């Protein structure tokens, strides 16, 4: 069994090298469970030079009092802790799936009160929790701040970058491992970045061709399930081969993305425009299609073929015109509109009108 598996891996590597104009599985899909997990915690930064939360910030005072109580220092009733050297902060971090206990990671520190700057501050021991409420890391250390703020007695102030936030490189120590299906599941699931039925089918076919029939199965447009080796010692090599398999994904749906605020228009390569005429302000866009019949010679073995010859004409009031080449694609229309000096707003309005008229064979998305 092990020998057959090694032979399949060698064959896979050989066939992968022969693929042309294809994409690797690792570039278009991610392995379920292999992800970044967000952690968050609430803490206190101390040691600030008078730039902490202002006196009267209730949650900062209560947090500081609770911390002192936990350290065995009793605060007399009614005594207020007035200190501008403390700031309440949120601590965030990203925990990778395969990081282990004892390893360290960077954390981000952000003030949640009215602190002016965290420069020179030290974060006190703060637990970092995941979405399940469990503590996965503990953070503490000196805050590195890239911004600075200064103010004068007359009220004038200067601020460079953002002094109310910072980072602690390697400021958190991992205390618990993230549960990962990679270790205990009988199968591995790949999730496509852009769900597509054709891509999922081709991906499963490519895996089955190289690793054996029945190894992979596309369960929907976004997921492909692959049988995993039972021995954990074989899974790393197995996934290494899988993620480098190359195949040709399915063509993306015809889409037009419009950013109405910036005037940006992004058009996919397979967008086609049907016969239509659009008038917008002082612009007139005409699209015509003429049938062209190709008739074979007498006694020839060919057959009659009918095709469409398209022509686009764009005019302004000053009689400027722009004739586009044959074949009406949206790229040709946009190029022609731009040639006569149309604004991005004109382009967007014309595209929306074409879509409403049913002349645009694409999905129009406005962001």
UniProtKB/Swiss-Prot annotation:
One of its GO terms (molecular function) is structural molecule activity. This is Flagellar P-ring protein. The gene is flgI. Assembles around the rod to form the L-ring and probably protects the motor/basal body from shearing forces during rotation. Its main location: periplasm. The basal body constitutes a major portion of the flagellar organelle and consists of four rings (L,P,S, and M) mounted on a central rod. One of its GO terms (biological process) is bacterial-type flagellum-dependent cell motility. GO terms for cellular component: bacterial-type flagellum basal body, distal rod, P ring; outer membrane-bounded periplasmic space. The keyword Signal applies. It comes from the Bacteria. The keyword Signal applies. It is found in: Periplasm; Bacterial flagellum basal body. Keywords: Bacterial flagellum, Periplasm, Signal. Residues 1-22 form the signal peptide. Belongs to the FlgI family. It comes from Legionella pneumophila subsp. pneumophila (strain Philadelphia 1 / ATCC 33152 / DSM 7513).
């Amino acid at each position: 069994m092990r020998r057959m598996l090694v032979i399949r891996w060698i064959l896979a590597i050989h066939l992968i090298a022969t693929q042309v104009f294809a994409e690797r599985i690792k570039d278009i899909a991610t392995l379920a469970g292999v992800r970044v997990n967000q952690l968050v915690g609430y803490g206190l930064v101390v040691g600030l030079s008078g730039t902490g939360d202002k006196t009267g910030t209730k949650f900062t005072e209560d947090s500081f009092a609770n911390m002192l109580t936990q350290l065995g220092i009793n605060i007399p009733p009614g005594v207020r802790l007035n200190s501008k050297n403390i700031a309440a902060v949120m601590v965030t971090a990203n925990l990778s799936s395969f990081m282990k206990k004892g390893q360290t990671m960077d954390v981000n520190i952000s003030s949640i009160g009215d602190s002016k700057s965290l420069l020179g501050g030290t974060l006190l021991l703060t637990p970092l929790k995941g979405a399940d409420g469990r503590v996965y890391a503990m953070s503490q250390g000196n805050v590195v701040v890239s911004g600075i703020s200064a103010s004068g007695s007359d009220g004038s102030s200067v601020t460079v970058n953002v002094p109310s936030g910072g980072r602690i490189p390697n400021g958190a120590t991992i205390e618990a491992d993230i549960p990962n299906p990679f270790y205990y599941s009988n199968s591995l699931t790949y999730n496509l970045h852009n769900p597509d039925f054709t891509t999922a089918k081709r991906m499963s076919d490519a895996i089955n061709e190289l690793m054996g029939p029945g190894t992979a199965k596309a369960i929907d447009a976004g997921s492909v399930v692959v049988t995993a080796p039972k021995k954990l010692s074989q899974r790393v090599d197995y996934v290494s081969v899988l993620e480098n398999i190359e195949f040709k994904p399915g063509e993306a749906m015809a889409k037009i993305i419009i950013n109405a605020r910036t005037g940006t228009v992004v058009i996919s390569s397979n967008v086609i425009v049907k016969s239509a005429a659009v008038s917008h302000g002082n612009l007139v866009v005409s699209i015509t299609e003429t049938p062209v019949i190709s008739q074979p010679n007498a006694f020839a073995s060919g057959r009659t073929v009918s095709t469409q010859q398209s022509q686009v004409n764009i005019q302004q009031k000053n009689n400027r015109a722009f004739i586009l080449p044959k074949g009406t694609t949206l790229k040709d229309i946009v190029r022609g509109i731009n040639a006569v000096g149309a604004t991005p707003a004109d382009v967007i309005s014309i595209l929306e009108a074409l879509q409403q008229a049913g002349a645009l064979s694409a999905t129009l998305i406005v962001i």
